[in-house]
């Protein structure tokens, strides 16, 4: 299988005088077609590792490689370009724009990449249909249930056909039934499109549905 994301000897420390390291010599590979889960207690560094993997945060030391390109250490321009071109994101709190319709929210990543309005609308509409949200396209975010909002967030995260999807506690604010449904949508999309996926979650039951479970504790990463 093709390696999409590779993290090599990555550490992340904060502070100078009272230095605290939340990640220590992390090594991780995510392959195309693989959906992996990252588990750990609150404060274990899951979000920090995901931010580094998504090129939003720079490691103190180590290397991050995305699709064969070294993205850390690298310039801000390189990280931004690679992130926009190859990555899709889903967060616990959806960050959807309240003043936009569902369709306009999902179109936004396409527009950021420079696609015209008609192309962006066509692609976004197709993704919403895949999510079973075609009837909600013209709705405002405030009109949706929590589960529907999170499915819109998933749609927005995958609309640009990213090489890898990174999700940080995407079901943390949902009830168990809706959590399972949203998690299933992510999993199925990764498999159907032969993408790579890494999801941070505190839900071990959901984590067991993935191809591989990784545990972060004391700044160290182990595979379960």
Curated annotation (Swiss-Prot):
ATP binds at residues 40-47. GO terms for cellular component: plasma membrane. SUPFAM superfamilies: P-loop containing nucleoside triphosphate hydrolases. Its main location: membrane. Residues 5-224 form the ABC transporter domain. Keywords: ATP-binding, Cell inner membrane, Cell membrane, Membrane, Nucleotide-binding, Translocase, Transport. One of its GO terms (molecular function) is transmembrane transporter activity. It comes from the Bacteria. Pfam families: ABC_tran (PF00005). GO terms for biological process: lipoprotein localization to outer membrane; protein localization to outer membrane. The keyword Transmembrane does not apply. It is a peripheral membrane protein. Its EC number is 7.6.2.-. It is found in: Cell inner membrane. Belongs to the ABC transporter superfamily. Lipoprotein translocase (TC 3.A.1.125) family. Part of the ABC transporter complex LolCDE involved in the translocation of mature outer membrane-directed lipoproteins, from the inner membrane to the periplasmic chaperone, LolA. Responsible for the formation of the LolA-lipoprotein complex in an ATP-dependent manner. PANTHER family: IMPORT ATP-BINDING PROTEIN, LIPOPROTEIN-RELEASING SYSTEM ATP-BINDING PROTEIN LOLD. The complex is composed of two ATP-binding proteins (LolD) and two transmembrane proteins (LolC and LolE). This is Lipoprotein-releasing system ATP-binding protein LolD. It comes from Anaplasma marginale (strain St. Maries).
